[in-house]
Amino acid sequence: MVRVARSVNARKKRRSILAAAKGYRGQRSRLYRKAKEQVLRSLVYAYRDRRKRKSSFRKLWIIRINAAARMEGVTYNRFLQGLKLANIELDRRSLAHLAVHNPDTFSALVGVAKDSLKNAPDPVAAPRLRGTSSRT
């Protein structure tokens, strides 16, 4: 029976793992087993955080829009409501960009939102009877 020579493949695999672990601290960049564990964990973190990054940026955009809107005297919620009433469909990313880089344009949008809030009809709430719920 012929032996299977795998030294080339094994060396290539080890070299690729150690190359991926380059820059890690201590044994994690030098010892194969430790490096392999850390590289696998790093790939898990990378996968998870690619999804997490989307919500992190959305939170950042909302914070920036809220801060800029409050400087103009309106809250984030009322500002977006006013934009919706004015049929202005800008996403949070572009609104945050305008708030940071083009404050004049953003304040014009705030003015439009305020005007549409003033001119909007008040929503009339239906009177609720005591003891009844809206769920059926």
From Swiss-Prot:
Gene3D superfamilies linked to this entry: 6.10.160.10, Ribosomal protein L20
ATP-binding listed as a keyword: no
Cellular component, GO annotation: ribonucleoprotein complex; ribosome
SUPFAM superfamilies to which the protein is assigned, alphabetical: Ribosomal protein L20 (SSF74731)
Domain of life from the UniProt record: Bacteria
GO terms of molecular function: rRNA binding; structural constituent of ribosome
Matching CDD domains: Ribosomal_L20 (cd07026)
Transmembrane segments: none
Role of this protein: Binds directly to 23S ribosomal RNA and is necessary for the in vitro assembly process of the 50S ribosomal subunit. It is not involved in the protein synthesizing functions of that subunit.
Family: Belongs to the bacterial ribosomal protein bL20 family.
Protein's recorded name: Large ribosomal subunit protein bL20
Naturally occurring in which organism (per UniProt): Tropheryma whipplei (strain TW08/27)
Gene name per UniProt: rplT
